[in-house]
């Protein structure tokens, strides 16, 4: 499979198309001028580690385990993404409450499936385990909400890769019988019901081979 250039979408790692930083800034300009709200997501198909600083991870272990390291531009810490995990991002010219609406929707969705879900300190937990992390980063007049939902979380790999101690222990939703396809459908349903992206449809940046 041809490796494609990385497109950092408010901390959302994409391998969808070749773009430059200038092209990305052009997209941000369109939002400022048009007041657009954009949402994107992807399903991870190759292991990747998103880092704010490379010093946060053991690069040799990443290479040994087959994880690519990609530097992000948000203020989140290191996140180890396994195949099947969901990454998503939303950005807008002004803070529009998307962050809180998504949290409420996803927690309710998990509870409807009988799971002990709660939101605390930028994370969604199930039985005390972290299954979703979010952060909001402000660049000038643009608000970025970036997040991930763990599906096939590999705790042994995370412990080996990350140099910083974990504040919360992660767990994949596959341990509760939930699949990537179900989470993808949930995310699209939320975006459709939320109605915050009338100017631009939700974009799926999956790989092409």
List PLM regions with ranges:
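Long, positively charged amphipathic alpha-helical accessory segments at protein N-termini or as interdomain linkers
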Residues: 37, 101-118, 130-209
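Active-site loop/lid in soluble adenylation, ligation, and acyl-transfer enzymes
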Residues: 6-64, 70-73, 167-209
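Ser/Thr-rich, low-complexity intrinsically disordered terminal regions
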Residues: 49, 55-56, 119-129
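Short beta-strand-to-loop capping motifs
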Residues: 53, 90-94, 151
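Contiguous, small/hydrophobic- and glycine-enriched helical/loop subdomains that border
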Residues: 82-125
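A glycine-rich, hydrophobic loop/mini-helix early in the fold
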Residues: 57-93
